[in-house]
Amino acid sequence: MANLKEIRNRITSVSSTMQITSAMKMVSAAKLKKAQDAITAMRPYAEKLTELLQNLSATLEGEVGGAYTTQREVKKVLLVAITSNRGLCGAFNSNVIKEIKNRTDFYAGKQVDVFAIGKKGNDVLSKTHKVHGHHNAIFDHLTFENVAGIADNLTEKFLSGEYDKIELIYNQFKNAATQIVQTEQFLPLAPLKSEVSASAGDYIFEPSKEEIVLTLIPKSLKTQLYKGIRDSFASEHGARMTAMHKATDNATELRNQLKLTYNKARQAAITNEILEIVGGAEALNG
């Protein structure tokens, strides 16, 4: 059994760790609230934009979307990996990296490159894939305008023929304890035809419907990427809060076990001292 000093040192060490994980949990909880409010507020906008685009497209004659919907033979694929800049968030990053590897296997025989958003994904995937661009600072100033520049970059890679297909892979936020890895096709767009929504009315358009659709497509792509990053951002803080909560609970349990061990060792030491004193006294009396 370890001596009393060693046990005391371990108790001090575990207590310090518990204070750190508890503080990180509270910080993540505060950040999660803001991130959750942001993604909750923008989802209806993104859904309405998609609905508007589909309703307009469904009332047009012929194929809509132009170069954005061009289906080419898939030879070169770009996977956009959205991860975090920091760790200590459970399986948050590893799940995305695992899905990147699954998609790479799915496209076996084709050129598969990565576009990394987040330092953790870039650090790991740069060892196994060709990384075309990485954006680590985006989370420091997460605004629609900053994400729009990245979306324009990705769109240009498709329109120029540099890549035949682009997919987004990220954690979708469900709640603090649950994040779902999503793979979404970014480009080419699926053919823009659908049933007209019951809420779609008969309107006079200025400019034409075609012009409006071609204006909405780039905005829709920017919104899709922004929503994906916002989802990932909220998921990161939820995963970190959950991980730190579990770490704090484990540290508390370990500290309690160490205290029990310490008390038993201290009690045994006192008992031995008493026995030695009694034994010495009996020897003197004898």
Swiss-Prot record:
Pfam families: ATP-synt. It is found in: Cell inner membrane. It is a peripheral membrane protein. The keyword Calcium does not apply. Keywords: ATP synthesis, Cell inner membrane, Cell membrane, CF(1), Hydrogen ion transport, Ion transport, Membrane, Transport. GO terms for biological process: proton motive force-driven plasma membrane ATP synthesis. InterPro entries: ATP_synth_F1_ATPase_gsu, ATP_synth_F1_gsu, ATP_synth_F1_gsu_CS. The keyword Cell membrane applies. GO terms for molecular function: ATP binding; proton-transporting ATP synthase activity, rotational mechanism. GO terms for cellular component: plasma membrane; proton-transporting ATP synthase complex. Produces ATP from ADP in the presence of a proton gradient across the membrane. The gamma chain is believed to be important in regulating ATPase activity and the flow of protons through the CF(0) complex. F-type ATPases have 2 components, CF(1) - the catalytic core - and CF(0) - the membrane proton channel. CF(1) has five subunits: alpha(3), beta(3), gamma(1), delta(1), epsilon(1). CF(0) has three main subunits: a, b and c. Belongs to the ATPase gamma chain family. This is ATP synthase gamma chain. It comes from Flavobacterium johnsoniae (strain ATCC 17061 / DSM 2064 / JCM 8514 / BCRC 14874 / CCUG 350202 / NBRC 14942 / NCIMB 11054 / UW101).
